[in-house]
Amino acid sequence: MGRIVAGLMGGVPVVVMQGRVHYYEGYSPEEVTFPLRVLGALGIRAVVLTCAAGGIAEGYRVGQLVALGDHINLMGWNPLIGPNEPRFAHRPGAGLRFPDMTEAYSKALRALAKQAAAEEGFALDEGVYLAVSGPSFETPAEIRAFRVLGATLVGMSTVPETIVARHMGIDVLGLACVANLAAGLGATALSHQEVFAAGRHVEQRLALLLERLVPGIAALVEPATNEEKQP
């Protein structure tokens, strides 16, 4: 079961969602992205999406945090398929039938995250996240193909939420934890247990990073105007 917690972090109003549903669990695209629609209706201007991912790039270490600079959608579906819903847009220029994804992940928020990470004493690399539908882990041959495509990370979430957030005009910062080395790159078979173990290993570092980040994000992202809040 997931949880929703609303409160203040560094004096900044935040909504934190713990847990998400996935397409591989049998949920529809609308259900997978519904939390983002709710957050958009609440008037949020930026979202930090976190995920666990398999590391494809050479040099990645289990437990490493990586900022998403771009993504490749190989899930086989797009959450915007169907009638366009411009009423969900919460910023001028958003809600388009064909939203631009040139900067799916905010360059300004990535720079802010790198600065916050440096202040915490570690480097935050950028990566390209490739999304598949799951639930089976990828094969070594697929990982070799994904590397040719330019992917440095692979996972089963995040991309649908990013697409919907950008459709609504919400700025996105994506942070991935390298939970394992992708298939064929490590010495052992992949398991969900190692994903959980990596998450526990990085949770404190991620919490400290977010504490530094939130005030900076609030200062960077302008609040919604009364006109924009009107339905």
Residue positions per predicted region:
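Active-site rim beta-loop-alpha module in soluble metabolic enzymes
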Residues: 100-147
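Metabolite-binding pocket within alpha/beta catalytic cores that recognizes anionic/polar moieties
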Residues: 1-101
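Zn-dependent metallopeptidase/amidohydrolase metal-coordination segment
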Residues: 156-194
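Non-catalytic positions within long, well-ordered alpha-helices that form the structural scaffold/packing
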Residues: 40-43, 147, 166
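Polyanion-binding loop/helix "lid" in catalytic or ligand-binding cores
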Residues: 92-106, 131-133, 143, 199-213, ...
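General beta-strand structural signal in soluble alpha/beta enzymes
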Residues: 16-18, 47-51, 67, 124-130, ...
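His/Asp/Glu-rich mid-to-C-terminal helical/loop segments that flank catalytic regions of hydrolases
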Residues: 183-231
